C-alpha cells in the first residue's frame, strides 16, 4: 500500500494531505504548525500508516528545511522537489485549477504518487549544499564590504 504525503510548506505552518492510489484520501488537507508538539504528532501519524510512505514538498526558499530535517531524522522518506516541476504537473483536465494551500498539498500528493519511483531522497548532501551556499553568500558580502572600505579609505587619504 502506497501512502503519498503532500506538504505545502509556509513560514509558520504547513498544509498536509495523505493520499493513496485511486485518489483515496487517507488524511484530508489540514494545517500543522511548526512547533515540536504538532510535528511529533505528524511523525507518529505518518509512521503508523500501513505500507510504504513517501513525503514530498516543494523546496521554496528556506521554509521547507526544518520540516524536511525533522521528518528525515525521524526515518521517513522525504523528497524536496523544485516548485516548477509541481507547477507543470498536469494531474487533471481542468482549465482553471484552484490556487490554495489545500489544493497545492493535494497536487503535491498526486505528484508523489505519479513520480513514486523517481523521487530523490532529501539527505545530508542537501543540508551541506545549503550551508555552502550560505557561506558563499556571506563571503561575497564580506568581500563587497572589504572593497567598499578600501575605496572609502583611499578617498579619505586623497
Regions found by a protein language model. Give the residues of each.
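Gly/Thr-rich phosphate-binding beta-strand-loop-beta motif of the actin/hexokinase/Hsp70
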Residues: 1-20, 108
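A general structural signal for well-ordered alpha-helical segments in protein cores
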Residues: 39, 64, 105-106
Amino acid at each position: 500500500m502506497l501512502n503519498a504525503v503532500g506538504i505545502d510548506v509556509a513560514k509558520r505552518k504547513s498544509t498536509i494531505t495523505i493520499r493513496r492510489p485511486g485518489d483515496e484520501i487517507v488524511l484530508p488537507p489540514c494545517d500543522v504548525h511548526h512547533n515540536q508538539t504538532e510535528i511529533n504528532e505528524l511523525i507518529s501519524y505518518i509512521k503508523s500508516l500501513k505500507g510504504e510512505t513517501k513525503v514530498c514538498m516543494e523546496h521554496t526558499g528556506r521554509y521547507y528545511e526544518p520540516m524536511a530535517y525533522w521528518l528525515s531524522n525521524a526515518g521517513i522518506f522525504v523528497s524536496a522537489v523544485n516548485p516548477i516541476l509541481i507547477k507543470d504537473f498536469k494531474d487533471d483536465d481542468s482549465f482553471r485549477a484552484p490556487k490554495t494551500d489545500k489544493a497545492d498539498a493535494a497536487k503535491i500528493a498526486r505528484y508523489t504518487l505519479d513520480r513514486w519511483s523517481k523521487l530523490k531522497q532529501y539527505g545530508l548532501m542537501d543540508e551541506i549544499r545549503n550551508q555552502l551556499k550560505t557561506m558563499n553568500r556571506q563571503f561575497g558580502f564580506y568581500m563587497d564590504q572589504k572593497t567598499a572600505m578600501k575605496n572609502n579609505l583611499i578617498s579619505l587619504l586623497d
